[in-house]
């Protein structure tokens, strides 16, 4: 295990190593098979070993301008539950439908999912104006951490300011830094604005199991973030 840790420290492009199966022998533990998975990243470690540094999501904040307004981007936390609930309540029925693909009321369970997160595999970011949330973007990776799904929603009077585009680029960079190589999202065919945004950001559309939706996907590459 120490040698595997040394490899992870020395080689930034190393995504994961799988040793399977592992059996016990009279002389100790033996791995009968192994595989190595790489990601797009420099092969050599920089002086700061930056590939090993992950800032605590809850402490990262950015200040954005949107027209004449100043917004703060930060990760959602458990104590944001009521702020998030108020944000979702302010959305129109149509905006909620385009985001959640249902006309049913948004339950407290949905709100909890966005504030009680496993930061190893998911994150949700809110754009705050003072104490009020104006937009939310979320990503959630699969169990292996190789691909992730996204969702984004912006309050109506803050739409058409380029916020959704900036939020998408923010999570693209974040998930790529975590080793995720592909980002995908399910978008209703009737959501013309989101479908245009996906095209603008370089996503490719594929048919979905749901006839009223498209799956937009993008392969994330090191050159896009270097």
Name these PLM-found stretches.
Residues 13-36, 150:
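Conserved metal-phosphate-binding beta-hairpin within the catalytic cores
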């Amino acid at each position: 295990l120490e040698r595997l840790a040394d490899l992870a420290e020395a080689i930034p492009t190393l995504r994961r190593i799988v040793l399977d199966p592992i059996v016990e022998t009279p002389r100790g533990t033996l791995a009968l098979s192994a595989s190595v998975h790489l990601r797009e990243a420099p092969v050599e470690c920089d002086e700061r070993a930056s590939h090993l540094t992950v800032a605590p999501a809850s402490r990262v904040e950015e200040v954005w301008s949107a027209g004449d307004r100043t917004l703060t981007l930060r990760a959602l936390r458990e104590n944001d539950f009521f702020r998030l609930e108020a944000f979702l309540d302010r959305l129109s029925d149509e905006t909620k439908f385009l985001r959640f693909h249902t006309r049913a009321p948004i339950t407290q369970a949905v709100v909890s999912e966005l504030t009680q997160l496993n930061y190893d595999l998911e994150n949700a970011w809110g754009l705050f104006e003072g104490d009020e949330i104006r937009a939310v973007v979320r990503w959630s990776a699969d169990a292996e951490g190789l691909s992730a799904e996204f969702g984004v929603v912006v309050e109506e009077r803050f739409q058409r300011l380029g916020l959704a585009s900036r939020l998408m680029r923010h999570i693209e960079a974040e998930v790529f830094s975590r080793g995720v190589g592909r980002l995908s999202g399910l978008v209703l065919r009737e959501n013309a604005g989101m479908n245009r945004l996906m095209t603008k950001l370089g996503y490719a559309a594929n048919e979905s199991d749901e006839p009223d939706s498209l799956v937009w996907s993008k392969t994330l590459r090191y050159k896009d973030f270097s």
